[in-house]
Amino acid sequence: VKRSLPVVATLLAGSGFCALVYQTAWMRQFRLIFGASTFATAAVLAIFMGGLGLGSALLGRRADRHPNPLRFYGNLELLIALSAALSQPLLWLVGKVYIALGGSVTMGVFGATLVRLILATLVLAIPTILMGGTLPAAARAVTTSDDAGRRRLALLYGINTLGAVAGALASTFFMLETFGNRKTLIIAVLLNLLIAMIARAMTSGADVSSAPVEESSSALPARFVYASAAIAGFAFLLMELVWYRMLGPLLGGTTFTFGLILAMALLGIALGGTAYSLWSGGGGATVSGFALTCTLEAALLMLPYALGDRIAILANYLRVLGHSGFGGFLFGWTIITAIVVLPPAIIAGVQFPLLIALLGRGREEIGEHVGRAYAWNTLGAIAGSLAGGFGFLPLFSAPGCWLIAAMLLVALGLGAALYARNIPSIVIAACAVACAFALGPTALWRHSGIGAGRAETPQNPNEIRTWTNATRRMTVWDADGRESAVALADADDRSFIVNGKSDGAARGDAGTQVMGGLVGAMLHPNPRKALVIGLGTGSTAGWLGAVPSMERVNVVELEPVVLRVAQACTAVNHDVLHNPKVHISIGDAREVLLASRDRYDIVFSEPSNPYRAGIASLFTRDFYEAVRARLDRDGIFLQWVQAYGIDVETMRTIYATIGAVFPHVATWRTGEGDLLIVATREPVTYDLARLRQRAAAEPYRSALHATWRVESAEGFLAHFLAGDRLTRVVSHDALLNTDDQTPIEFGFARSLGDSSRFHMDQVIALAFGLGCAKPERMNGTIDWHAVLLQRAFEIDLTPVPSIAGADERVHHEFASLWDKSNFGGAMTVWTRNGRWMPVNSAEAAMVAESIVYSGAPDDPAPYLAMLRAWEPLEADVIEAAFRIRKGDRAAAIALLRRAFAGYRATAWPQPEIMGRGLALAKSVGAPAEMYAALEQPFAAAQLEELRLRTLYDLGRQIDHCGPRTLAALKRLEPWAPWQLELLQDRVNCYAQAGLHDLAAAAQNDLRDYQANMPEALAR
């Protein structure tokens, strides 16, 4: 037996490797069939884990009775390999059956969940039940009667889990990317067969029977041990969900992120099991030891909670390692994951073999003990997973569940400690409870965009507090939903944040969110039915629902909490939630497309970035084939693609994948850094008469002006970048993104630190070079020079000298200078080139502002009149500046009051212009009137931070430390802007007003600020 221990441990490591590869591949394949919702994932996970637990309980007892446990183990591995190989045709059959039944679209949530359970059982029951028996059989084969603490079992458990670590890392970081799902699973099957053959070859004759051994000295009833195993499993799986939810925003939310978290949790368990096996002393397990593991695990869980945002700040600083490439990012992620996950996972690894040792000594009934303990542990884990996903996370939030998991372990440990009269465990439990009173993770950790690379990098403690307070102050609310963590943030715009990354702003992203759908409606001859994938701010669905010919707009949204976002964005989305044409369903878009029988004129897909975990499945050839099947013959598919932070190979793969399904693929630009791929089965005819008619009719007229700041068919076509030919050229020899193999999921995530990026200018230059920069099929004539002039004021694009005419370069130079607030320079360009008439309202605003703010003698009236026809609030602000220049402050005050009142009703004026209006409010000489005009927020939280700071400045002008100053300061609490003058004002004003609690908090803040100021050279 002793001689076989190293070999059996090696075999069990391979078994753990295969099991994790199987689990990863199966979960990915089932998500493609059932969808990625929590309901679907939980059904599959419950069957997988349930099979393991049931197999452990049933086969553990049989392992004790088998004359040769090692042969029994080898037979199990052989059957696992065969049943895993059989899973592939079964998955194909399951997909056909589920789609034929109509999925959740037809069966509803309850019916679909029941069917998922049945179908998942068909595929997973046999292999998972067999897997559950491998550890009991191996333990029976190598454990000796003199092993009182069952340390050989612990070693096997640790080595088996170490193999699982290797499986998690290999599948996530190499196998799935290189081979795809099916080949990865086949490789695991072949390895499993090798393990089975080696195990069977090692066996000869019957196993040696064991001598009777004394009962465990734990004096604990077995039911307590099994209940403890269940509670520990519940707490650990609940905590795994918390780790995924909490670490995703810090590490980027990619497939690599979640694979790393899983591997780190398994590594901790492996190290803990191995450590237990090497524990000094030959005695058995004790209740005191178990109490110590529970309380220590709880304390180590709570330590990162108590550290709170300090861990987020560390994660932000570690992102600098990404400058060296993907390996640098991975190293930084590993540090953060190790800090949060590894210590409690190590203790959990000690805990499980200790529980089994409490049930008995040596090899007597070890198979049954392992089987039953594992079954109860797995049952608790299933309950923790289901409770966390369906109830606890949405109800208590991820930080709340963090506390619940730790307090469960504290309670379990205290119970055991009191039973064993173990004082150290009680002290450790008290430390864990004390950590619960810390502030814990805040919006800085969860919603500041650290993992997405959107966070600032502060250089000193006061800059850290500036960033910390601003992030917390701007977060209006956050919530943990079934699928994601969602937050609403008000800064310069109202934006929503999903799993740590901003997924859209009410006004700032309206060019894509509004026009992404309306481009299809403009081009389609008679749009009547549309499908929108992702609700977001509700803008796409709301504006499509406003199209007169549109009869129905179906929206599929995965996360129910996002409906709260749409409700908060009614100022920009045509009150989408109350539009009878718009029908919102909660579910997975893939499943809906595959299972429904509806047909559409327009399908618009704007998921999150494809490098984020699970999103790449909405960019696969299989998904696009499902879209094509749901489109009418002249239907239009619209795919948003980010043009920022993306590598060229990923962009080529996206083009190639769409082009493999749709023969006609055009490229549009909807906003800064946003591309729109317009894909059809038939070539699109651009009917200029129809385009002009629609550009002048609602809702197109308002949408074109509000989001793109154009007012004509020429302005609309200015956002067309390239036709079919570009797609064919770019797609040549590019990899395809398929359900089986998703290169953009892995390759894109790997390239995030790469300095060689794609830029939209590349599309423009290539389109001109290929001669496909204009639509190929046009009815009617158009002055393309006028189209290019409309594009010229898009300042984020760089006119390519070889393709841009002189006029375009001049207009672009003028717009660029205006964007930098260089109004004198802009005036020089404008006057030097003949004082041209603006091509649209946006350029009219630029000309008027340049005249007013540069002090030029030109009369802004003609340009203000042109602007006022489209955007009267902008005209009011610019005219107010002109009146101040002329000394007519009364007129300026009236204009500003009117502009601010109007800004509360509409979010569409340009923020740059309205921001200059807020600056005028402080200098116009009427602080009380301006204060009153700014007390209410603007529509969709436009310029909210600037408005609040302006109120404070105006309050100081009116009554320094008086009622209005106090009211303005309270609006900034409790996370006040970290600036010395304001911090001093808080102390003085609150003290004068007798607001002692606020004054004390303000004094502490001021003291912190001053303590972190640079020391003066001279004193």
Predicted regions and their residues:
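Alpha-helical segment of the N-proximal tetratricopeptide repeat
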Residues: I782-G825, E843-Y853
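Generic helix N-cap/helix-start motif at coil->alpha-helix transitions
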Residues: I803-H812, W836-M846, W870-I878, A905-G917, ...
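SAM/dcSAM-binding transferase cores
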Residues: L688-F793
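Alpha-helical transmembrane segments of multi-pass membrane proteins
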Residues: V1-Q693, F748, D754
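Secondary-structure-rich domain cores
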Residues: W836-Y863, L867-I884, A891
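Residue at a conserved register position within TPR or TPR-like alpha-solenoid repeats
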Residues: L817, I851, R883, A921-V924, ...
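Alpha-helical repeat scaffolds
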Residues: T798-I803, N822-R835, A856-A869, R889-G902, ...
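Terminal, low-structured helical/coil segments at or just beyond the last alpha-helical repeat
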Residues: W978, D985, C989-Q992, H996-R1019
